[in-house]
Amino acid sequence: MTVANHARPIRRALLSVSDKTGILEFAKALHAQGVELLSTGGTARLLADNGVPVIEVSDYTGHPEIMDGRVKTLHPKVHGGILARRGLDENVMAANNINAIDLVAVNLYPFADTVAKAGCTLEDAIENIDIGGPTMVRAAAKNHKDVTIVVNAADYNRVLAEMAVNNGSTTHATRFDLAIAAFEHTAGYDGMIANYFGTMVPMHRVPAHSTDECFQDSLSVEGSKFPRTFNTQLVKKQDLRYGENSHQAAAFYVDTKIDEASVATAVQLQGKALSYNNIADTDAALECVKEFSEPACVIVKHANPCGVALGKDLLDAYNRAYQTDPTSAFGGIIAFNGELDAATASAIVERQFVEVIIAPVVSQGARDVVAKKTNVRLLECGQWNTKTQTLDYKRVNGGLLVQDRDQGMVGLDDIKVVTKRQPTESELKDLMFCWKVAKFVKSNAIVYAKDGMTIGVGAGQMSRVYSAKIAGIKAADEGLEVVNSVMASDAFFPFRDGIDAAAAAGISCIIQPGGSMRDAEIIAAADEHGMAMVMTGMRHFRH
């Protein structure tokens, strides 16, 4: 029999879990198949209290748990039984009174849950660092040729089902797969611990060998939000046909610790497989539309919003968003912040070619409509309530830039009017709409908007004035009236030329962060043109 299908019978199992979900049922099923059960502490008490025959590990080894339970399973009879190579180590086992342990079911102390609690002390964290658990897990995973390791309650039934059809045995293929999961489990666990303690290392902003006087204070006695070594664990959701370009291999990994509605949580209801670019663009569209509470639609092309609008309903919002730039909307990604209905879905598929449509909920009527266009990727991401504070990553050659996700957003109470003219109520409403859109446009970003609808988007230009000019050109190309519309800039204006270009186009009001050394000149230019201007004090660069 080859290793590929070599079955190993399970006659003795060691069960020791912190998360006791399903463990009682698992133990009963193992006992019913004649498996001898070893266990520790709370797990052993749970089994015994429910009438499941179990041997305490301390009784099995002849050595009591010591040091308040810090040492329970670190014993040759335990680890020898797990690590013993069947057909090779029997003489050693017999000489040392060691019995083979064929299955290990272990999950670890809840370190992440503990340190996430308000008021968690260093001592609390230390006492929730599991020692014996990871040791047993790694031992069983190492010896997966002979031992079955289970670290996830979701795999209990899988093991039982395989035992049922293999005369109480598991196959090598299953043991190998479970061993990989075990190593992933311990790697993630140790990574969490390293990250937690790594934030206690003094902050370090520049290389220690730097002699530049301006960096003499680069070391701080305070800890850092970011650990000395950065450990994260992502799970592969799917392999992709290729990456950003066809010569690049790619895959999509997700952070399973985050449950906020996103492209990562989305379920694909129909359509071709998502591509690398589809996923990136869908993320940009969805995160933008999540900024709005009113019915909203965002159309994205190459990671930039090309049309964003509010409406009395989603159909109205889509029609208005499409109107901004029908040319760029071709082959775009469309995101909504409400339930996609049949009427809106019909308008989309009858009007344009679309790569992806995503919404928190998709009605059955909308599904039936889109089903007629089999290539359209239709995604349902679920409702979002709050946003999770996560990290953003940017790969550079030889390293990784890590920062907080940009969740900043100002309200009417946060902005400051800096010009002689005050914005009108309708202008203020459009300013806030426009500012939310600008946050998701590649820098340098300029957005023109009017009545809750973008009328021109200038994205990704090296000079801000050219982004302003492009926004005006876009509006003119679509026959959209710029006069008395508002403008948002993701960062400050370094010169007055951007203000002059906006005035020439007919812009009446501007929202921008401020902070330029020429702010006074910029404000004077706005006053000269009779424009209103507000400053947010918050920048939204996007690269």
Swiss-Prot record:
SUPFAM superfamilies for this protein: Cytidine deaminase-like (SSF53927), Methylglyoxal synthase-like (SSF52335)
Recorded coiled-coil stretches: none
Gene Ontology CC: one annotated term: cytosol
Positions of the MGS-like domain: 5-151
Pathway: Purine metabolism; IMP biosynthesis via de novo pathway; 5-formamido-1-(5-phospho-D-ribosyl)imidazole-4-carboxamide from 5-amino-1-(5-phospho-D-ribosyl)imidazole-4-carboxamide (10-formyl THF route): step 1/1; Purine metabolism; IMP biosynthesis via de novo pathway; IMP from 5-formamido-1-(5-phospho-D-ribosyl)imidazole-4-carboxamide: step 1/1
Domain of life where this protein originates: Bacteria
One Gene Ontology biological process: 'de novo' IMP biosynthetic process
Molecular functions (GO terms): IMP cyclohydrolase activity; phosphoribosylaminoimidazolecarboxamide formyltransferase activity
Enzyme Commission (EC) number: 2.1.2.3, 3.5.4.10
Entry keyword annotation includes Hydrolase: yes
PANTHER family for the chain: BIFUNCTIONAL PURINE BIOSYNTHESIS PROTEIN ATIC, BIFUNCTIONAL PURINE BIOSYNTHESIS PROTEIN PURH
Family per record: Belongs to the PurH family.
NCBIfam families noted in UniProt: PRK00881.1 (NF002049), purH (TIGR00355)
Protein name stated in the entry: Bifunctional purine biosynthesis protein PurH
Source species of the chain: Shewanella oneidensis (strain ATCC 700550 / JCM 31522 / CIP 106686 / LMG 19005 / NCIMB 14063 / MR-1)
